[in-house]
Amino acid sequence: MFCQQSNNGYWKFENTKINLIRGEVFCMRLLIIAPEQIPVPPPMGGSVEHCIYEIARRFSSSHHVTIISKWRTGYAKTSKMGHVTIHRITASSSKNYLSKAIHKAKGMAFDRIQIDNRPKFVPAVKKAFPSIPISVFLHSTTFISAPMTTISQANKDFKGADLLIGNSISLEHHLKATFPHHSHKVRHVHLGVDVTQYRPSARRQAGSHPFTVVYAGRLIPKKGIPVLIRAMKKVRETVPSARLFIAGGTGKPSYKLHLKKLAGTLGVPVTFKGNVKHSKMPAFYASGDCFVCPSQGHEAFGLVNVEAMASGLPAVASRNGGIPEIITHRQNGLLVTDYRRPDAFAKEIVAVATEPGLARRLSTRAREDVLQKFSWKATAQKLQAIYISKLR
């Protein structure tokens, strides 16, 4: 039994309640099908898988959550943590993974199935479990647009789902505008951060030097790292000690080489840290004085901004996608409207470096806002409330 009856005859689910019907005991049994590429929890990177793991952990006190994800050497085939069970499977392809995931789930009882970031999985899952409601939790526009799919195909895939959940209001609006036939299904749930793990660093409070800018994210063109490197050249005209640390991996070594050559040509000191384990990310943020997110493509949410803010770092970010839902300009961070221009970023970075009062104010407010709005507990509670409202 995964929940308990309260004195007033309702079953409690944190801030939500379900009336008992005909005296039946009901506890939500949720199946989450993760993408096929990275295990849950991910050793490093894998923001989608990281989110699945963190949210499921917060669900577990009230419901039973089963996760199916990829297996990798070093992982158990099955893990149990409280009311969360993770089954990991080997697969040679995306199609093979889905087939094995469905086979693994057969024979188990679920009240809802959540598919993360893979709309194309919906038809096969719906065919296998026709009576179970399916939600699609989307973390970006990548798998609902070219070259991964077409609008027409995504429309067909969404037919089998009763909920489409985006990780920001921006993504919610995009889904409603792009798929109007499914607009009634769309909701949003902001992501969160472990506020006990990510916390302000004594190093920055001591005002150490040199001035260090940090970036965390994939090394791909739409993340805007060349814009940041060029901005750093401008920053160094005012702050000669300024340097850049970059954490993140790339699928194309040639792109990383391109970034290194650009930094060398411009005379910007850049240290590439590579893929950093999740357990080491708090220390990475602690090494910085300012965090920059120079995204050039649509950033659905921008979880790295929340991690940096929880760490007490002043954040400078593109006014793009869901980022303004996290950062309010000159209150808890700095937004760059003209984010194609390196000098626009340089201006805000220099402000953080040369105005200690501003930096302290942004840092304090950023931490306060994350504590209030962006904890994983808050994420899980909102998602849970959406699911339970559909079960009434």
Regions found by a protein language model. Give the residues of each.
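Carbohydrate-associated surface elements
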Residues: 170, 192
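Glycosyltransferase donor-sugar binding loop
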Residues: 243-257
